[in-house]
A protein has these predicted regions:
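Metal/cofactor-centered catalytic core regions of large enzymes
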Residues: 2-597
Length: 597
């Protein structure tokens, strides 16, 4: 018996053929997606399932709060460091620690470095091949490719000979029958719209980005000792600075700082002359995707804000990336967000594999409970081999966070919309320029294509802020200010018996919050609400669907057994790690396997 109902402007109907993609990708765990399609191959129902239990909140109970960052940092290895940053913010907020100006600046440098790196890796390595047809690049004319590239930017690696060499490398790869990571792509799918020359240019830049991303993270190794999972410290940053070439071994000196400047300059060059033109090229060939994948982006979006310009000040006046919330599509009214208000952020579990004393009620993270309860209910298959989920019951290891009762989209698109409608001049100029170049209305940014464009915009914005913060650091150092940590309250004896704190920032994928309660010098409660929790949210007691689920609604699939459209939209939210994806029929039999990038 089919179920049909109205929610958030969509008609959800689980009749029709069921298509299962499992796993989609690994984002802080594994993800499964099931959709129903009608006779016209239009998605009428979408079900997003997180299939791995994380449990770090339980692991942290009873531990030293000063160690929390090192545990939670392991939640994700791609957006590395951002959970550690939210954690030290939370512990410092609880204990009442004020960090030095240099510590705040270096933390912003670390976060900006992560954003630049993550946006480049996402655009090319994780989502690029959803738009670039690798095999079609073999049909390109290298001379025409060179003309195309040189018409878009002054990037020096754009000669006919360069593209001929790249094409020849690809041809040898294909002729050898060893496609490797490209083996299971849907090459030739009718949704691939780029010309052969644009495909060759995109593939060449894919290889360049794969090499260049190793350079960007050297900034993390200079200030944080390593990457992934650089080092942090409650009270500041654990990096000594010594400009006279003497003193402690490993201290940051002018040679290291000059290297940082060199990397920032090269990163800006790559983003401005490669990534942004490539994003616009994809947009020129795929304008139809400015009307696909809207989901919640025209209704409900959320950003906490990030990059405090003033140390220890997390007000909207201090945050260079503004925060706010929009509900019901009222973008003229961007509302303030208070992470301590129990009426604003609540997590629900009535469709997740967790238990509350009353599953019908949401709980603020300070009152959060992480009590896993795997109970898939009436499903096709068995509890250990689910062939088809039952979204009327519990179906995910991800809770359902809501802001004032609304499902929200977070991430670059949400941040861009918030900043734009709060009147941020740089955002307005950048977005208007992009949409004008593509001859698309502003509403076109609320789409799958828009999420791609917003990452390019953010990368350009962020590398400018990376230079800004580095210049401020150098000014402080030249003025003799070398302090990077405040250890006055390092010893637990100086802490209150009971205290609570909130740490928030913006990960590349969206709003990130950590809530910590400390009692008798140990962690009593710790809760993380991460970007994927918002976007991959299951249904709630009102049957509201999450951002992933909403973005897939109404999408028409050209070839259901080759679900490129599903991957494009879900990847536009920024998946993390590569994994093997299997497309299943409604009887659980495998139809085809692809490599999710």
């Amino acid at each position: 018996m089919s179920n049909q109902y109205q929610t958030q402007g969509y008609t959800v109907n689980d009749a029709g053929r069921r298509l299962i993609v499992d796993p989609i990708t690994r984002i802080e765990g594994h993800m499964r997606c099931e959709v129903n399609i009608d006779e016209q191959n239009v998605i009428t129902n979408a079900v997003s399932c997180g299939t791995m239990f994380r449990g770090l909140e339980i692991i942290l109970q009873g531990r030293d709060p000063r160690d929390a960052w090192a545990f939670v940092e392991r939640i994700c290895g791609v957006c590395t460091g951002v959970h550690a940053l939210a954690s030290v913010y939370a512990i410092e907020d609880a204990i009442g620690i004020q960090v030095p100006d240099n510590a705040n600046i270096i933390r912003n440098i670390m976060l900006a470095t992560l954003w630049c790196h993550d946006h480049l890796v996402h655009f090319y390595q994780l989502a690029g091949m959803d738009w670039i047809d690798v095999l079609n690049a073999l049909k390109a004319d290298p001379r025409a490719t060179s003309q195309l590239a040189q018409s878009l930017s002054a990037w020096p690696m754009s000669s006919p000979g360069y593209f001929f060499d790249v094409q020849n490398r690809l041809k040898k790869f294909v002729d050898g029958g060893q496609l490797g990571i490209f083996r299971n792509g849907y090459w030739g799918h009718p949704q691939y719209k780029l010309s052969p020359e644009a495909n060759l240019m995109g593939f060449a830049h894919y290889l360049e980005a794969l090499d260049f991303q190793r350079e960007i993270v050297k900034i993390h190794t200079i200030f944080g000792g390593k990457n992934p999972h650089p080092n942090w410290i409650v009270g500041g940053m654990p990096c000594a600075i010594n400009l006279d070439q003497s003193g402690a071994v490993g201290a940051i000196n002018m040679e290291r700082l000059n290297l940082v400047q060199s990397i920032i300059t090269r990163t800006a060059d790559f983003i401005n002359n490669v990534m942004v033109p490539d994003a616009l090229a994809i947009g020129q060939f795929n304008k139809a995707w400015s009307q696909i994948g809207t989901g919640l982006s025209d209704k409900c979006v959320l950003s906490y804000g990030a990059f405090p310009d003033i140390a220890n000040d997390f007000s909207q006046q201090s945050l260079l990336m503004p925060g706010g919330a929009v509900i019901n599509g009222d973008f003229k009214n961007v509302m303030p967000v208070d992470l301590a208000d129990p009426q604003q952020i609540q997590e629900f579990v009535d469709h997740a594999w967790y238990r509350y004393p009353d599953d019908r009620l949401g709980r603020h993270p300070f009152d959060g409970i992480t009590d896993p309860w795997y109970n898939p209910g009436d499903v096709k298959g068995s509890d250990t081999h689910i062939q088809q989920l039952n979204e009327q019951e519990r179906y995910s290891w991800i809770k359902a966070p809501r802001w004032r009762g609304h499902a929200m989209e977070v991430g670059p698109l949400a941040r861009t919309l918030i900043a734009y409608h709060k009147g941020d001049a740089a955002t307005i100029e950048s977005v208007d320029r992009m949409m004008s170049a593509l001859k698309l209305p502003l509403s076109g940014i609320q789409s799958t294509l828009g999420r791609i464009l917003c990452r390019a915009h953010e990368a350009q914005w962020t590398v400018g802020k990376l230079q800004y913060f580095f210049d401020r650091l150098m000014t402080n150092l030249k003025n003799g200010d070398l302090a990077t940590a405040n250890t006055e309250k390092w010893e637990p004896a100086s802490w209150p018996q009971h205290c609570r704190g909130i740490g928030f920032t913006e990960a590349p994928r969206g709003a990130l919050g950590h809530w910590a309660s400390i009692r008798d010098q140990k962690i009593e409660l710790y809760q993380c609400v991460v970007p994927t929790t918002w976007n991959a949210s299951p249904r709630d007691p009102k049957k509201q669907i999450g951002a992933y689920e909403a973005a897939l609604m109404g999408t028409q699939m050209a070839i259901p057994d080759q679900p490129l459209e599903i991957l494009r939209t879900l990847h536009s939210f920024d998946p993390c790690l590569a994994c093997s994806t299997h497309v299943l029929g409604d009887d659980g039999s495998e139809l085809i396997a692809v490599q999710v990038r």
